[in-house]
Amino acid sequence: YNDGKITYVLVDEMCQVLREFMEVMKTYRVQDYRAYASSALREARNSQIVLDQILVRTGVRVIPINNSELRFMTYKAVASKDAEFQKTVQTGTAIVDVGFGSSQISLFDKDTLVSTQNLILGVLRLSEMAAHWKVNYHMIPEVIDELVDNELYTFKKMYLKDRQIKNLIATGESIIYMVKKGMKEANRDRFTAEQFKAFCKKLTSMSVDEIEDYYEIEHDYAALLIPGAIIYKKVLDMLGAESVWIPGIRLCDGIAAEYAEESRLIKFHHDFEGDILSSARNMAKRYKCYAAHTQEVERTAVALFNATRKYHGLSNRERLLLQIAAILHACGKFVSITKSTENAYQIIMATEIIGLSHLEREIVANVVRYNIQEFAYDGVILESDFSRHG
């Protein structure tokens, strides 16, 4: 994260691991797979070279995905624990997914996603920042504390406000290690806020060597548990939640849930499309869109889409994108009424909408951009790589 590129040594190591993994897949006669790249590869300057090297040297086709897609997968994996999930999100609930490059906080109320926000608070990113600044080991928790406080203050003022959060659902790689090996009640997945805070406080007071021995993990990974514990504790303090549920979900579970749904192996009872629309409506509310007008535009757009379905042949996914465009078509007026469509384009492109790929966000942004002006067929330049959507 500090250098902005992946070294050839790491590329060699990745290729070696992937080659060995491919051999394991052959042993089990695996017929299909999914390989995704998250923030480390997505943000690297040499990402395309690395992806090409992996494909040539291992035969593995890696698909880079944006943060909103990645978090949506994890969210689906949590929702796959159907009964517990539905019961938990009936009251004010937050899902906190702490990753290596960033963290995601999603707020629920009465079974509906209210808002979701990505924060640049990843355990590896924070650890590398502390190392780059040559921070004294004993000062690392204090420095990370300050970085986390700064990000959470903005989130609290903009998104949390007076919302009451009763439950916290904690997901991510680090929380699994922290709980499975660090808490005496390892056979449980629910804890009171006080129990969880006490555990996090104990972990942050340990040295990396002590964590390495106690958790029986490698030294490099042991160093990542400290920022993880700080993030979870700080978020819990900010939310004021009473209980913590740790379902043991990580990104791999999310990938499996996504694949199972696409292959029609499982069917979710939760309305994920409703969550995406709810997120868009809350975004429109934040930018002071006129609700009555927006609702009428959305209703008319959907009616026209449905009435002309036999002519355009588009799917329900395209209808969802049209709905989002209708909901957000006036958000640019928050910045300037005279150039509202151009401003709306910039706002949508700068905002992650959970569950949408970068290409889908570009489609929505361009539909809004050319809402009241002539469509420039030769003027639209998309950033997305179409090869992964073919």
Predicted regions and their residues:
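Helical "lid/coupling" subdomains associated with nucleotide-phosphate turnover
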Residues: N2-Y28, A40-R45, V50, V56-Q90, ...
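Post-signal peptide N-terminal segment of secreted/secretory-pathway proteins
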Residues: D32-Y33
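Two-metal-ion RNase H-like nuclease active-site motif
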Residues: G92-V96
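Active-site-adjacent helix-turn-beta-strand microarchitecture at beta-sheet edges
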Residues: G99-S102
